[in-house]
Amino acid sequence: MQTLKVDLGERSYPIYIGEGLLDQPELLAPHIAGRQVAIVSNETVAPLYLERLSKTLGAYSVLPVVLPDGEKYKNWETLQLVFDALLSARHDRRTTVVALGGGVIGDMAGFAAACYQRGVDFIQVPTTLLSQVDSSVGGKTGINHPLGKNMVGAFYQPNAVLIDTTSLKTLPQRELSAGLAEIIKYGLICDEPFLGWLEDNMQALRALEPVALTEAIRRSCAAKAAVVGADERESGVRATLNLGHTFGHAIETHMGYGVWLHGEAVAAGTVMALEMSMRLGWIDQPARDRGIRLLQDAGLPVVPPQEMTPAHFMEHMAVDKKVLDGRLRLVLLRQMGEAVVTDDYPKEILQATLAADYRAIVAQL
């Protein structure tokens, strides 16, 4: 097992990474103050791991809360089910909410914990690669709104993050690839040597080779923890973690939540960010192509939806959380391994990026 730390002073917490951690109650016990535990999961993950985690937490009074599965259920109505369950079971302020699932479950369970009786303890047990390397770390919680993704939520840090890498054995290949999009992101924004490592180990990662998988998760979590420790509430450097997300969130919203997986939309959005960075003269074509090839090798889509026009993108990006004073800020690459958040770009460059023929770009690789 490896242990990392998210350093936030009195609110610091550990990230445990290893095999078989779901069966180790001694890891969770120090982070549970009361006798009541609510495990929030979904209809897909619960049959696989809920009984196992409930047994590990056998010393506590465990309340299972099983929600419908999918991004389209990340809304007020589903969140209300968590509150209904907690109140019906008379859970008090010393309860601990445990999120068992992917990013949707982690975001909703965390938001429920932030709101319930003005805040109760919260533990992340992510079971998808994307949630293990990204959404479970850093305290972003929330739900979607019909007009925009993750528009209602709170910063609320967990007491601990427990990553059992064996849970990835039940993950569909499409979901695994979606998680690889976020791993690739770390190399692009802050760790250029990591890109070379990923190029050498991509097939091992897709085959769930344990050593490669643990190293990729550790390296990604370490990068995320460092950024969160420096900028918890995304007032500065943390926004660089959103490479590809402004374009990607527009894709998710326009196509309908859940049609494109989050990681898939981020991958296509990252290609657009690479293209715009090249058009600004910040990276060259070989660098752009290198990023696209790596996303392709991960089994990810690298062409935005053909039905989306520049006007569609602009409509959805206008409500992006990085918009300040009416100016759309974008995360772009100054060079491979260095990202910047900027609103200082010619509008015609953005329009050209949105209108680019990505099928032709990919075809010439």
UniProtKB/Swiss-Prot annotation:
Q: Which residues does the record give as Zn(2+) binding sites?
A: 182, 245, 262
Catalysed conversion reaction: 7-phospho-2-dehydro-3-deoxy-D-arabino-heptonate = 3-dehydroquinate + phosphate
- Give cofactor(s), names only: Co(2+); Zn(2+); NAD(+)
Single biological process term from Gene Ontology: chorismate biosynthetic process
Instruction: Enumerate the GO terms in the molecular function aspect.
Output: 3-dehydroquinate synthase activity; metal ion binding; nucleotide binding
| Locations listed in the record | Cytoplasm
Pfam families per the record? DHQ_synthase, DHQS_C
In UniProt terms, what function does this protein have?
Catalyzes the conversion of 3-deoxy-D-arabino-heptulosonate 7-phosphate (DAHP) to dehydroquinate (DHQ).
Task: Write down what this protein is called.
Answer: 3-dehydroquinate synthase
Organism in which the protein naturally occurs: Pseudomonas entomophila (strain L48)
The coding gene here is aroB
